[in-house]
Amino acid sequence: MTLLTPTRKTLALALAATLLAAAPALSFAQAQPAPAAASMQGASPSQLVLDNTKRVLETLESRRAEFTRDRAALQKFVSGEFNTMFDRDYAARQVLGRHGRGASDADVKAFGDALADNLMRRYGSSLLDFNTQLRVRIKSESPLPRGLGVKVSSELLRSGGEPIPVDYLMRRAGSGWRVFDVMVEGVSFVQTFRQQFDSELQRKSIAQVAQELRSGRIAADASSD
């Protein structure tokens, strides 16, 4: 089993934590057709994250042998869950920061798709090292400034170890909720990659960086600070 460095482990945890919130966005969008239904028990982002944690962890555990043997099946599972709940375009604009001002929706989408696909290729297999015996405890749900959405603060509880703090930043997308940033132990998914790609984006266009991510010439890298 590969030993993850602290930074790489943090990203693997962020990906795993993101998967834990995957099904809620879809189930909420499908199961809550009327605005009034949003007040129903279990409709909050916190409850949706909590309710679906068990299913995702059980899937990773029950299919571990299959995923170890068939990495294509793992990638399909990871990509499917990730695509369901992660607001790629909004997250991409956050990662681009000042470089995204005035950028076309098409360029932002291309960058977001390339970044997500690169992450899945590089770090998806790290989920095979993930401790599926973890439990999740929701600590709080609080509104983000300027009505941007909500922050769901949680902890991953592990036997014999300190709880791992995980915060989800979520926003309304259509009739459901989607995650646009995950913070594990205070490390932000968005901030990590905003810093990493800043120098590239100073020298190249968004389309060029997206193409190089897609081709593998540059990579979303969490192996060093």
Located regions from the model:
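Short beta-strand edge/turn micro-motifs at domain boundaries
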Residues: P163-Q191
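Low-complexity, intrinsically disordered terminal/linker segments enriched in charged
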Residues: D181-D225
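Early exported N-terminus immediately downstream of N-terminal targeting peptides
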Residues: A38-Y123
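C-terminal segment of classical bacterial N-terminal signal peptides
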Residues: T18-A29
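Surface-exposed, charged secondary-structure patches
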Residues: F111-D113, R121-I164, G216-D225
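Bacterial N-terminal signal peptides that target proteins for export
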Residues: T2-L15, A25
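Solvent-exposed loop/turn segments at secondary-structure junctions
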Residues: G100, D117-N118, P143-L144, L157-R158, ...
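Compositionally biased, proline/threonine/alanine/serine-rich low-complexity intrinsically disordered stretches
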Residues: F28-K54, E58, Q208-Q211, S215-D225
